[in-house]
Design a protein with these regions (language model features):
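Extended amphipathic ligand-handling, pore-lining, and cofactor/metal-binding catalytic surfaces
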Residues: 1-238
């Protein structure tokens, strides 16, 4: 709903400006993380899947973005090209993080002749400071400075459908249904409830990795021996 409404809003802005058929691009935004962490995400022993761009973190966002676009096209008939971008980079400048930064992407798209931008905060569920500052302030200001029509789609927050979805996830995990019976919105299939042993490696020595059954404090090693009930974990839905 939000993405379709955002597309309609940008189209209305362009129509008011006398350019109703000008090209529009959708940017799905999520929090950037260090490239090394992204490449290690999901790389647990025995994981059968090959992740797009070599990262479970990136693959999940790309799959979710594709699912959103498919739903928008089916329900509203609206369509536009889209891409995944990143925000909120921090840390040492010499450490590579996932790119492109949303502001760089907006500038590149403007140079390609794009006239409208729809920003979808795909990686966020509420309007906290990083959404309000990085998107509503910086990204939309970049759009204004380049003369682009733009809007930022709201996060789900306490939207009824989002809350109902959370209830469904809880119900799945408290039911006796087989994991394989859980529905999934993307080709990645049902996801794990907690990180599998060896997943999401901790590259920062001496700092704990807290991820369910994944590791002991400060070592980055498995908290449960392979094959144990604790190591097995469950699977969830993404």
């Amino acid at each position: 709903e939000g993405t379709a409404a955002g597309l309609a809003d940008v189209r209305a802005q362009l129509t008011a400006a006398g350019t109703p058929d000008a090209p529009v691009h959708i940017l799905f935004a999520t929090h950037s993380i260090p490239t090394r962490d992204a490449e290690a995400a999901g790389r647990s022993e025995g994981e059968p899947r090959e992740f797009e761009e070599g990262s479970a973190y990136v693959a999940q966002h790309l799959a979710t973005g594709a699912a959103v676009i498919s739903r928008v096209e089916a329900e509203s008939g609206l369509t536009a090209p889209w891409s995944l971008v990143y925000q909120s980079r921090s840390g040492a400048p010499h450490v590579p993080w996932l790119e492109p930064d949303i502001n760089d992407a907006i500038a590149d798209l403007a140079g390609q002749g794009i006239k409208g931008i729809v920003i979808v905060p795909l990686g966020f569920v509420s309007d906290h400071m990083e959404v309000v500052w990085d998107l509503d302030t910086e990204a939309l200001e970049t759009c204004r400075s380049l003369g682009l029509a733009a809007t930022r789609v709201p996060t789900p927050g306490a939207h009824r459908k989002f809350v109902n979805g959370l209830v469904d996830l809880i119900s799945e995990r408290t039911s006796a249904n087989n994991i394989s019976d859980r529905p999934a919105m993307t080709g990645l299939g049902p996801w794990y409830d907690v990180c599998r042993p060896g997943c999401c490696a901790n590259f920062r020595g001496g700092k704990p990795t807290i991820a369910g059954a994944d590791s002991t404090v400060g070592t980055g090693h498995d908290a449960y021996p392979a094959g144990s009930a604790g190591a097995a974990g469950g699977e969830g839905t993404l």
